[in-house]
Regions:
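Ligand-binding cleft/hinge of the Venus flytrap
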Residues: 1-12, 44-46, 111
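Residues at alpha-helix termini
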Residues: 5, 29, 46-47, 154-155, ...
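Short helix-initiation/N-cap motifs at beta->coil->alpha
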Residues: 7-27
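A generic structural signal for short
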Residues: 10-11, 135-136, 180
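Residues that cap or flank secondary-structure elements
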Residues: 14, 31-32, 139
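Pocket-lining segment of extracytoplasmic ligand-binding domains
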Residues: 21-112
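Secondary-structure end/capping motifs
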Residues: 77-161
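Conserved C-terminal helix/tail region of periplasmic/extracytoplasmic solute-binding proteins
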Residues: 149-209
Length: 209
């Protein structure tokens, strides 16, 4: 985001704080500004801070990704358990992707201390189906590689890191196929744009190899 506007980390003084400390620092004027997520909406709604940038164009480069991690040893010893977990997550993603369930989804997520109003604000202008997609597509893999490359460029790590071999999409593909959901979610290319139909087939083939 800084580079997009011709800035570098040397143009600002960066302090690494956890979420709670960041909010406290903002409210007490301990910092001039902060990067954050949906947790900042509740401070804005209380009139405690102003939000000057909120990714209005939904640029996927400024999004966060999450993944389910399993150790290699456990996966080899208990593949059926791994499949059960992935199956359950796919079922949950399918239900959560239905816009008709949006308020129920937000109410459930609000149990983690994110106000429903903040969740609504965070998801404004975007679809639940895209947001909760479980796909391991070229966009997801590309984002992990981009972060690794940036860490090397910023000298946070000494050696380049490749994410090749980090992902095992076989369990996901099995879950999607058994539920007839192979084409329910849209796979995206590295730039976050929907690839052509033939590109999807190539990406799926490579990931499953």
């Amino acid at each position: 985001l800084l580079a997009e506007r011709g800035l570098t980390e040397r143009d600002i003084k960066v302090i690494n704080l956890d979420t709670g400390s960041t909010q406290a620092a903002l409210v007490s004027n301990g910092v001039d500004a902060a990067f954050g997520g949906r947790e900042l909406f509740k401070l804005r709604d209380k009139g405690l801070i102003d939000i000057i940038y909120d990714n209005p164009s939904q640029d996927v480069r400024y999004t966060r990704q999450t993944a389910l991690v399993v150790s290699s040893d456990y996966e080899k010893e208990h593949p059926q358990n791994v499949q059960k977990v992935v199956d359950t997550l796919v079922d949950a993603a399918k239900w959560s992707s239905d816009e008709g369930h949006a308020e129920q989804v937000f109410a459930e997520w609000a149990k983690s201390n994110d106000p429903v109003e903040s969740l609504r604000a965070d998801f404004a202008g975007s679809s639940l189906r895209d947001k909760v997609s479980p796909l391991v597509d070229n966009f997801l893999i590309g984002r992990y590689q981009a972060v690794a490359d940036q860490a090397k460029a910023e000298k946070l790590i000494r050696r380049p890191v490749t994410v090749e071999g980090w992902f095992a999409p076989g369990y996901l593909q099995a879950a999607l196929k058994s539920r007839g959901l192979e084409h329910y979610w849209t796979p995206y290319g590295p730039d976050g744009k929907q690839p052509a139909a033939d590109a999807v087939a190539v990406a799926t083939s490579k990931q499953g190899s």
